[in-house]
Amino acid sequence: MNLHHLLKARRAAGKPVRVALIGAGKFGSMFLSQVPHTPGLEVPVIVDLDPERAREACRTVGWDAERIAATAFTPDAAKATAGPIEVIVEATGNPAAGIRHARAAIAAGKHIVMVNVEADVLAGPLLAEEAQSAGVVYSLAYGDQPALTAEMVDWARATGFRVVAAGKGTKYLPAYHDVTPADVWSHYGLTADAAQSGGMNPQMFNSFLDGTKSAIEMAAIANACGLDVPSDGLLFPPCGVDDLPHVMRPRDQGGVLERSGVVEVVSSLERDGRPVFRDLRWGVYVVLEAPNDYAADCFKQYGLKTDSSGRYAAMYKPYHLIGLELNISILSAALRREPTGQPADFRGDVAAVAKRDLRAGEMLDGEGGYTVWGKLMPAAASLNAGADAVVTRRAMEQRFGGVAQTKQSD
């Protein structure tokens, strides 16, 4: 609660926090919009495959000509680790590139804030371990839902509550698993032309809709918070904020969860397409359990919504502000040497499920594409099913799963 005070002290001492940004897309641009309004924070290097696009993004978000002229725009990621940079923000969205950039940052003694949740789910526990050995911070990105959820889980546990469930809200119907970039805009109430004029990527937005992004983010939360994942994928139950304590409790207590201590996503739509009352589409939540009758009585006395037993309650944030909130991660790493969420285990994985019959030899086109959607699975189950051909996955299993692997390929 004192980041602003610490930053003011750094500024007064003439030692601003210097950041390099890799990837000036939507998330990165939202972060850049806050930089001129955060005295003591500087971004001297911006890396993007299209430097002119990155420069234009700075103009769009309100940077003046002097600030732009003082910034190095480059396609060379190696420039991010040069000079007096303290924190590197990886916001490319490309998992292979993200892992390379993170390892280079760690090797150079820089803190790394991983906006790239795909890279985090693939190799986050290993990267966090590598960073710790190097004496730097590896952090999830505050403003995105995994870090915000991890914060709520930490709050609940630090105050003595058992976490029953944690996760986020989204717009979901079962039919969305089969949606492709060709028809995604109809589900957002947009025309293709309107989406294009707004710079919206159909495949990226389809990954939000078809369930893939939810699976990836819940895997990140499970790995960071030590929570379990559902044994057969996310349920996406329709649920508003007032019903969280009723719905998000174990089945033997009247809820939908197979057990306590899991991640789950709630839908803002009823299964017939009607909107859920007081939905949590843009927010995050944690459901907690009172440890005793006294705490349960306090829930009631202070107006906390509970289930019928009075023992289960929920806390939530109705919105997340993406890159507008990213400074919290950057300043936490630089000024407190503390992450805003960090993977510590390999508990959740995401498996590709075909959207249609696939031809032999057909190339999968990634999250939000035409061929597959991503399903959340327990990591142990995905590895046992054979999803361990990638070298990084073998390393994850060896380090965090306790199962020795001897072959390098199957």
Where are each of the predicted segments found?
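N-terminal Rossmann-like dinucleotide-binding module
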Residues: 1-62
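C-terminal catalytic/substrate-binding lobe primarily of soluble NAD(P)-dependent oxidoreductases
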Residues: 2-10, 187-410
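Generic secondary-structure signature for well-ordered alpha-helical cores
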Residues: 36-40, 59, 63-66, 132-137, ...
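Short, ordered loop/turn segments at secondary-structure junctions
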Residues: 49, 93, 117-120, 143-144, ...
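A structured beta-alpha segment of the ubiquitous adenosine-cofactor-binding alpha/beta core
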Residues: 64-96
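Rossmann-fold NAD(P)-binding glycine/threonine-rich loop
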Residues: 92, 96-108, 115-146, 151-155
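Rossmann-like NAD(P)H-binding beta-loop-alpha module
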Residues: 131, 139-209
